[in-house]
Design a protein with these regions (language model features):
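Predominantly soluble domains enriched in secretory-pathway, periplasmic, or organellar proteins
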Residues: 1-200
């Protein structure tokens, strides 16, 4: 397991065995020795050959850095948006989706960067909400989800169409009697059929 230390510009490779955790290696990251560049999000690609790290504290933009899991050495890097944060790789599209958290910027809609991890090229950016975080890919690899912290919305991105497909207003939701959250605020962006109270 790779764990980032945002205030220390290091990544620890941890090994779990029985009831013990061992730090196998501590990897120094970043390119400016006198500045904290803020390693934030980490993900390993589906084939296990590479791991990716977002360096959030850019000037002004952050970076996505690609490492080899065999050597833990830098393979390539690319510039993303303001404070790139959490990310995952879709097993269906092969693309990496990284939210640009924009922690220090103005409270306006930010973006999800879509990156080809083979060439380390940012293909496009998709506008979502203010301060998006918590990027997750659906099990089938067809959708990317993130929550905009300041606008209180869940965004669903079509991983193939590269556009927002639905949004859910989280601030207006109430718990049902059975403890399950209502999904009646989920709005389709493309007219797709509504499901269990999701609005088109």
């Amino acid at each position: 397991m790779y764990v980032a230390s945002e205030s220390d510009d290091t990544v620890s490779l941890l090994k779990f065995e029985n009831n013990e955790i061992t730090e196998v290696e501590r990897i120094t990251v970043g390119t400016y020795p006198t500045e904290i560049e803020g390693p934030h999000g980490i993900t390993v690609d589906p084939n296990g050959k590479f791991w990716y790290l977002s360096l959030a504290h850019g000037n002004p933009f952050g970076k996505l850095v690609k490492y080899s899991t065999e050597s833990n050495e830098v393979v390539d890097e690319t510039t993303l948006g303001l404070f790139p944060a959490s990310m995952q790789v879709s097993t269906t599209t092969g693309f990496l989706y990284c939210v640009n958290f924009n922690l220090h910027g103005s409270m306006k809609p930010s973006t999800v960067s879509v990156v080809d991890p083979v060439t380390m090229t940012e293909i496009t950016t998709i506008t979502t909400g203010s301060m998006p975080h918590g990027s997750r890919i659906s099990p089938d690899g067809l959708y990317q989800y993130s929550v905009a912290m300041m606008s209180g919305e869940l965004f669903e991105v079509d991983a193939l169409g590269l556009e927002v497909s639905r949004t859910l207003d989280l601030e207006s939701k109430m718990m049902k009697k059975d403890g399950m959250k209502s999904m009646d605020g989920m709005k389709s962006m493309d007219g797709m059929k509504s499901m269990d109270g999701m609005k088109s």
